[in-house]
Structure formats: C-alpha cells, structure tokens
C-alpha cells in the first residue's frame, strides 16, 4: 500500500552532529523536514547490542520507501535523532571498557543535553530497542524531567522465560574474558533466523548487514554480560513518564510473562491497557498503528503476532500530524 506522504521522504534532510562525554566523542545524526510546518516533537532513537544507530534507524533499501524509521517520523513532522553509543559506529572506541548498559545511559545523558541545547526542545521522546530499551529505561529513571514519552521495544526485565538469553548465558565465560566480540555479515543474518525465519525481506537483511559491517567488525560485550548476569537493571516503579512497551510474537528475548510482571509494578496511578494486534502487514502498518496510542494513557503494552522485534516507535501530539495511509 502506498503511503500518502511518501513523496515527503525525498525532502527529509540529514545532518551530522557530535557531542562530548568526557574524552569520548559521540556521533549523532539528525533528520527532519526543512519547513516551517508545526513539529510534533523530538524523538531520540537508541540502538541495540550488535549494531550502530544509522543502520538500525536510517536504513536505505532500494525500491522500498520508508525503510528508515527516521525518515518515516521526520515526514510526520518530528525532529528525529539517533546516537552511536560509545564503542559503536562512529563514536569513540579508545577506552578499554565493555560499554555496559549503565555506560549507555550516560551516553544518553550527554546526547539529550546536546539536543536540548541545540534545538531548545522540551520533553524529548525516547525509543529504545533490545539493550537500547534497557539503556533508555535506566536513563529515564535518572532524568525523567528531560523526557516526554518512552517506547521500549524488545525490552526484557528479569529475563524470565527467555530462550535467547538461556542460550546466550552458555557463552557468558567467553564474553567475560574480552571487551569486544567479532561480528560479520553472517552474524547479522543469524539475528533474523534466531527467533523465527522469514519475518524480514531478504533484501532488507542484506542492506542491514552491509550497513552494520561497513561501520564495525566487532561490538562491545557489556550489554550481553549485563543481560546474561545482571538483570534486572530497571525498577518499574521508577518509570514515571508515559510509556509504551512493544513486543513481537517471536521475540526470543522478551517473554510476555516477564513484561506483564514489569507492568504490574508500574506506578499505581498509571492507566494500563493491553492490545493484541494480529497479522500486522509489516513495519509501515505497525508504525501507523502506533499513532493511535491514546494520548492520555500512561502505560500501554502491545504484542505483535507478525514478527520479532519491531523497528519503529510512536510518540503522538494529537493536535496536528500529516496523514499516512
């Protein structure tokens, strides 16, 4: 199905930014429509354990419009940002550390401070996927005043019922012996066969793998070590901003049981709503569905039966937004 504002993707502008965290240089990427139209807000996207930010959130796939989450939300009037965590992509890799979840939360502190100073925005919306969701949640506990809304995709709390983490823990001694682990094209392909095959178009996997491997041939071990041995790292009672949790049917890291227990411990004044979305027609449909998230609800759980971890997030100002079919 053709999106009604597909023509806007070609108008989206990208700009490179850099900020400091001590002696660490953090690469940031900003995409937006260069117009005077009303902006719906600012979104910062947070990547996971095995890929930098641009391959994750600004992917280009020939003949496939809006493969970039940043382009999609920029076309909707959002000011979109992503940041390479320390040890990933274009950001500094010189320190002899594992770049764990807590370190990633520090990266987000530096990134959000820069965005607020640069653009003057208030209430940055934050989207994190997998270990990026953990980084985002830890940061939210520390700096709730900087945020508008929070989206946690492929999130895990205690790790209960996670077949992926059960298998990954078998390699914990290996991960603990080194600061980084090698990755290559075949490794990236294996990510899409881990939970359930055939959930993603082959040309998307190819473009994704090539983009990741063009920036990195190894990844930090810190988030793997944390997810295998140090969960939980987030206290749900300290998440006080409006939050949506996204989970794909075949997500091998985040079990429904684990996530619902997390929800049970959220703020008592929160409105909790569970939706089961069946047979979703791919990422564009999923992103547009997220726009219908009721503005007043504080915490919402979505379970998607059509795929693994879903790329995208949604933060909605109901007063004004372009139409997407």
Residue ranges and their predicted role:
Residues 105-123:
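Conserved acidic catalytic loop of the alpha/beta-hydrolase fold
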Residues 54-55, 81-99:
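Glycine-rich "HGGG/HGxG" loop immediately N-terminal to the catalytic nucleophile
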Residues 4-37:
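N-terminal cap/lid segment of alpha/beta-hydrolase-fold proteins
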Residues 165-246:
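Alpha/beta-hydrolase
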Residues 252-258:
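Conserved alpha/beta-hydrolase "acid-adjacent" motif
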Residues 266-283:
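Catalytic histidine neighborhood in serine/cysteine hydrolases
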Residues 35-78:
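Short, surface-exposed "cap/lid" segments of acyl-processing enzymes
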Residues 122-127, 131-159:
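Conserved hydrolase catalytic core segment
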